[in-house]
Amino acid sequence: MFTATANECDKPVVLSVDNILNAVMAINSRVECTSDDIVLAQISLHNEFGFIYSLIWPLYNGAMVCIGRGLRHVDADTYYYNPTILIGTPSMIDYQRAISGFNKELNTIIIGGASCPFRLFENLCDSDLKVYNIYGMTETSGCVGVNELYDGSYTLFDNNAVSIADDGEIIVSGPCVMKGYYNDVESTENVLKDGVYHTGDYGRINNAGRLVLLQRNPDIILLPTGEKISRVRTNEQITAINGVAEGFIIFYNIRLTAVI
């Protein structure tokens, strides 16, 4: 599995079978999937969210998995396979909503790869769909918490695995944490200390014991497509262009924008 870190855009992450099975058990504790379900896999399976949530998890529960052909055919694939559970990123699910791309058999939507905007979450819930937004990253097998409430807070899959550091950083331990970055001890030791993963995200635990995200890792740009971009590395590449004195990337009107 690959992810982006503060200094690299394509960083290989080592996940074990135990990591993946722990994620499956965590999902099963909050979301129902049975042998009667049909799951449409429309996210690339080299992506941790797509691999675990749209392939391994449903297969473990005996559900039928249908492999989609990508975003270009997502509406046709949805009506062809008639899934009961749909897995997607915020941008993918929002696109399907906009084109009325949900089949009548659909009852559950799982959104991951990025935080689900409140507008989209509210709209889906108003359609009598069960909606779950997953919080996690590749380094934690994609299973830290799940949101199914309008307030945007996350129920933790394991209350003992998540804590808040003195500076507000969210840190994660336990069986969901990766083994490390592939063949890179130094990068691993920078974020994984005594088995505790430092996410770079910031948050708090509310009175109900739910996780509230306050800020995502400022060194990484997380797109609604679920893609991650190293802010530092991308800024360096822009500045290295001949004739560019200074450049950086920002979000402007919910769009990724380069300022040069």
What is each of the regions a protein language model found here?
Residues 130, 149, 155-156, 165-191, ...:
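Conserved ATP/PPi-binding loop(s) of AMP-dependent carboxylate-activating enzymes
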Residues 21-38, 45-85:
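Conserved AMP-binding/adenylation subdomain of ANL enzymes
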